[in-house]
A protein has these predicted regions:
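Short coil/turn linkers that connect adjacent helices within long alpha-helical scaffolds
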Residues: 34-35
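Short, hydrophobic, well-ordered secondary-structure elements
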Residues: 38-58
Length: 154
């Protein structure tokens, strides 16, 4: 494996799509807090999560993800980190429906005339996306460090 190339490709992908995910998350927060536009906030949050998972997949595997479904993406990537696994897993106290909700946001927020969500629920989902984005950023950073270290040994 050419680790210098793997590092360069992964770093480019990381810088591009992590930035887009973070920008969408900021736009979601603005839509939520400034204009109270739940539809845009939901759509942008869900799309940010998709970008974060695409980034993680590419950094770890060097390939594009073949899905844009947050439920499938999480299921395939969750074993990379217990923190990531626990960010969306149910507890003995509550069932966490964030991933299925994000999936529905991707389809229903832009196109569904009857789309509606309580602001309190959306805020919880947005916070989980923010938390997962941070976890993914840290995981990618560790992987990029490994690629760089291995490329220096070649």
């Amino acid at each position: 494996i050419d680790f210098a190339k793997a590092y360069a490709d992964a770093k480019f992908h990381f810088d591009t799509f992590r930035t887009q995910g973070n920008e969408l998350l900021e736009q979601a927060q603005d839509a939520f807090s400034e204009s109270r536009n739940m539809r845009l906030a939901a759509q942008f949050s869900a799309q940010a999560m998709v970008y974060f998972y695409h980034t993680l997949y590419y950094v770890y595997h060097g390939l594009e993800f073949d899905s844009h479904d947050p439920v499938i993406m999480h299921d395939r990537m969750r074993t990379l980190s217990t923190k990531l696994m626990l960010a969306f897993d149910d507890t003995h106290i509550e069932n966490i429906f964030t991933l299925p909700r994000l999936k529905s946001f991707l389809m229903k927020a832009p196109y569904g005339i009857r789309f509606d969500i309580a602001p309190q629920k959306l805020e919880i989902h947005m916070e989980r996306v923010r938390k997962a984005g941070g976890i993914i950023e840290n995981l990618c950073g560790l992987r990029l460090e490994l690629y760089k270290e291995l490329s220096e040994r070649q």
